Amino acid sequence: MSQASSGFTPAAQVQHGSSKGAFNSAYIPTEEEKRVFRECNSESFWYRSLPFSAIAVGITQVLVAKGMLSPSPRFGALPKIAFAGIFGYIGGKMSYVRVCQEKFMKLENSPLGEALRQGRLRHVSSEMNQPDFDPNSSESQQPGSESVQQPATEVSSATESYSSYTSDYTYSTPSQSYETTPFSSGFSDSGPANIRDDLPSQAPLYMEEDVPKRKPVLYEELRNKNRENYEVTLPQKNQTQMKPQMEVMQPKKEAKKNKYGDSWEE
């Protein structure tokens, strides 16, 4: 952008300086910027601060009336309502900052608007093109490229060291070096591994020998045993039932009685 199109004069550029230190405590805004400041103050008050304060005060009064907020014993609900109004006023002002920035950026001959535009463009470009234009990113990527090239050399060196190790220390497979031994010889110091190999295979044999095998009991055998027991107990029951009957069937001898009706024996 040229000086004629932007409206900047050399004096203005010297006064405001570079983009980094453009605005200091001695900056004097232009008439257009003052007008935008007044518009932002009035619009932020009527469109944001006043509605937000009214809503906050109304909500606080409702909460105090319903008992959700306890009023002060000395001042009542006034402190809470005042705090809600101040909070709504500040929140409304802060919410209108973005709109004011847009208004300043629309000004053509405003150093403040130009600074805001450059700051936004710089922020957007840093977010969009940071991996492409950041010099530190290229330096940070160099160790990654070196690490990509290193695995091939590391693999080759690892294979060489492994081959040298295997040539120095030969070994055999477990099936070739270990031979199975009986369980009795497994308790020697030379064969601790054989104990683990023989125990699982020989333990079931000893368990089977200790436990006697039981023949399955058939239903017919149980039935015959019950019949034998019943036949043995049946005569005993018959004898016990016949004894009372024999006693009942024996007639009693009539004793002689005297004239008074008493029985007496000779």
Curated annotation (Swiss-Prot):
Instruction: Write out the entry's keywords from A to Z.
Output: Endosome
Outline the segment boundaries, as ranges, of region: Disordered.
Answer: 127-213, 225-266
Renumbered to this chain, the Low complexity biased-composition regions fall at 156-178
Domain annotation OCIA: ranges: 1-114
Q: Where in the cell is it found?
A: Endosome
Stretches of Basic and acidic residues bias are at 250-266
- Which GO terms of the cellular component aspect does the record hold? endosome
In this chain, composition skew of type Polar residues spans: 135-155, 179-188
- Which family, according to the similarity comment? Belongs to the OCIAD1 family.
Q: Under what name is this protein listed?
A: OCIA domain-containing protein 1
* Species for this entry: Danio rerio
